[in-house]
Curated annotation (Swiss-Prot):
Pfam families, sorted: KH_2 (PF07650), Ribosomal_S3_C (PF00189)
Keywords: Ribonucleoprotein, Ribosomal protein, RNA-binding, rRNA-binding
Keyword rRNA-binding: yes
GO biological process, one term: translation
InterPro entries: KH_dom-like_a/b, KH_dom_type_2, KH_sf_prok-type, Ribosomal_S3_C_sf, Ribosomal_uS3_bac-typ, Ribosomal_uS3_C, Ribosomal_uS3_CS
Stored HAMAP family: Ribosomal_uS3_B (MF_01309_B)
Name listed for the protein in its UniProt record: Small ribosomal subunit protein uS3
Originating organism: Phytoplasma mali (strain AT)
Domain KH type-2: start-end pairs: 39-111
Any one GO molecular function term: rRNA binding
NCBIfam families cross-referenced by the UniProt entry: rpsC_bact (TIGR01009)
Cellular component annotations (GO), alphabetically ordered: cytosolic small ribosomal subunit
Amino acid sequence: MGQKSNPNGLRLGIIKNWDSKWFANFKKTPQFIHEDFCIRNFINKNYSKALIAQIEIERSKKKDKEIIKINLHVAKSNIINGKDNESLKKITKQIEQITKKEVFFNVIEIKNPDKVAILVAKTMAEQLEQRFYFRRVQKMAIQKVLKTGVKGVKTLISGRLGGLEMARSEGYLEGRVPLNTLRADVEYAFTEAHTTYGSFGVKVWIFHGDVLPGETILDTRKPFAIKSNYISKNNKKSNNYKGDK
């Protein structure tokens, strides 16, 4: 059944962690889930050009005040930060208006976007919308991903390929992508491309390697220094943050 299920959801709690990290009683859970949905929808809709890979939301309480911390993993941090962090301050105020809570932002720049499945899928979708040939799009994407040193990559595009009336699917596989092995660090992403021939579905699987007992994904993937800005209501910057993607 590993072929049919979402590889990200199948590995949650085993080698992967949740994007929303908080605890709440049953009365507040629906409210928090709705707030998380609104936050992610707002950021993805208004700042898609920044190539957003992941939005992590953490909640805490300090002196009867609810605080939301958002870790934003992006490929183009300049679009989010803007000049003198003006864009970041604007996003913070807008999300505070939506949630009515104090919001802290941590922008984490991804050093190698070709290694992240969702960014590869978004790039492929953008090329399809620019009328690139679907086979060329997949081969170019696979070549770039393999240069990063991953163990395997798989792509699949579905829709009216080549403008034909009958929809079909076509994909490529290079290396090894073990979907049934739970310790395998398989990253999966899906997005859509809207073209003159209709909507195309784009799927990408990237195999980073096996996660051994006692290790996590962060241990197996090589860490690197990144730039980040941490902005609150008081517009204070935190120390440089080091993360991994």
